[in-house]
A protein has these predicted regions:
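Conserved short histidine dyad/triad with adjacent acidic residue
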Residues: 26-43, 52
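An amphipathic alpha-helical interaction segment
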Residues: 121-122, 129-185, 189-192, 196
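Basic/polar phosphate-binding segments, predominantly the helix-turn-helix DNA-binding elements
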Residues: 171-179, 196-234
Length: 234
């Protein structure tokens, strides 16, 4: 059986998702009143998640969705995302985190240039929330279950099968994708600023930080920064 890693929300940024030659890793996330949320974060890899139990509020790229058991979520590379569960509830999910380079996003062929590289760069946006009623849901559930089986058994050549299943995932979502230009420019700028602030806090967490320092990073007044930060971070 392949090793699985339990995802601790506060440690996710430091987690190495698989290895250099096989950048693929499974995580099981469990949330409850003791740990009711995964704080906003991002990483270079994409995610495919199945909610196994409970419901939650997901925020991906500043878009909020209410997800529940049986729903699937696709988080593109470098997308800011977070989730929170209702009080007095329990949430469980299975997530596969993978780098788009594993699928060939860095190669020079038509699949990479037309599809994989744009998805990796977020210039082509695939749907993030695939509800049980979504047309792509049945096929994606079949794919997810196959990924589970192949990953757990880890038979010779299983990496090739996983790669093909992830490519199929992208292919199934492609008809429902849209160009990045459909996203408001202001939202893009806010996302970039928030990622910059979170990265700065992560790098200087041991130091005494002031609102003035963080506001300066965004070229905001302290008042504007406080409103901006509260809006997206709560």
């Amino acid at each position: 059986m392949t090793n699985r890693t339990t995802l601790l929300p506060e440690q996710k940024e430091q987690t190495r998702h698989g290895g250099c030659l096989f950048p693929f890793q499974k995580y099981i996330t469990v949330l409850s009143d003791l740990c009711p949320s995964v704080t906003p974060h991002w990483h270079d890899e994409a995610e495919l998640t199945l909610i196994k139990r409970g419901r939650c509020t997901y925020q991906i790229r500043f878009e909020t969705c209410e997800a529940e058991q049986g729903d699937l979520l696709f988080v593109p590379p470098a997308a800011l995302h977070s989730l929170m569960i209702p009080s007095k509830s329990r949430y469980e999910s299975e997530t596969y985190v993978f780098h788009m380079s594993f699928l060939g996003a860095n190669t020079a062929d038509i699949c990479a240039v037309r599809y994989l590289a744009p998805v990796a760069a977020q210039s082509l946006l695939l749907p993030c929330h695939i509800r049980k009623g979504h047309p792509a849901h049945p096929e994606l559930m079949e794919i997810f279950n196959s990924i589970n089986s192949v990953y757990e058994n880890a038979a010779p050549g299983y990496e090739l099968i996983l790669k093909s299943l992830l490519l199929r995932t992208i292919a199934v979502l492609l008809p429902y994708g849209k160009e990045e230009s459909s996203r408001p420019q202001l939202q893009t700028e806010h996302m970039d600023k928030l990622k910059l602030v979170l990265e700065y806090i992560s790098e200087h967490y041991a130091e005494e930080l002031s609102i003035a320092q963080l506001a300066k990073l965004c070229f905001f007044s302290e008042y504007h920064f406080m409103r901006f930060f509260k809006k997206y971070m709560g």
